[in-house]
Amino acid sequence: MTEAATAQEITITRVLEAPRELVWKAWTEPDHLVRWWGTGARGWTLPPSAVTMEVTPGGTFRVTLTNDEDGTEMTTEGVYREVVEPERLVIDEPAEGAWHEGAVTELTLSDLGDGRTEMVVKTTIQTTDEMRRNAETGMAGSVDRLAEILESR
């Protein structure tokens, strides 16, 4: 029996030791994104040539991770629904060609002062419980990697 996809929510909150503008760049500039996106699980590579970002409302987002061991590719793509620099991004990820049946990711960055930023990433995704757990593990690993990079600057 195949498990039916249902609306699942994943929320990750982190306080980062970096100014909000730098965290914003980490999410919106390919040279920054390739250093942490999807690499938290290690064993995955995101080359700059595999990133397309048009960070404007209606602009597109596409990243293709490559598995270092077997060359398998995993693509995430979407459309920026909302862009409020340097505070908020909303990305709509349609189901076509994806491992899920549609998702919306909301990024909120709050300036805490003293060079610190609270980052909240909330993804609402149509998927199975098992795939949600896998997605949450991957997202948490990527966010941990982002925190490591920002704190080592």
Task: Report residues per predicted region.
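Short amphipathic alpha-helical signal-transduction/dimerization elements
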Residues: 28, 143-151
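Hydrophobic pocket/interface hotspot
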Residues: 23, 33, 61, 80, ...
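Beta-strand/loop substructures that line and gate deep hydrophobic ligand-binding cavities in soluble
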Residues: 90-140
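A short, structured loop/turn motif at beta-sheet edges
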Residues: 20, 55-56, 81-88, 108-118
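A generic structural micro-feature
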Residues: 4-8, 53-55, 70-74, 98-101, ...
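Short beta-edge strand/loop motif at the mouth of beta-sheet-based domains
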Residues: 11, 31-73
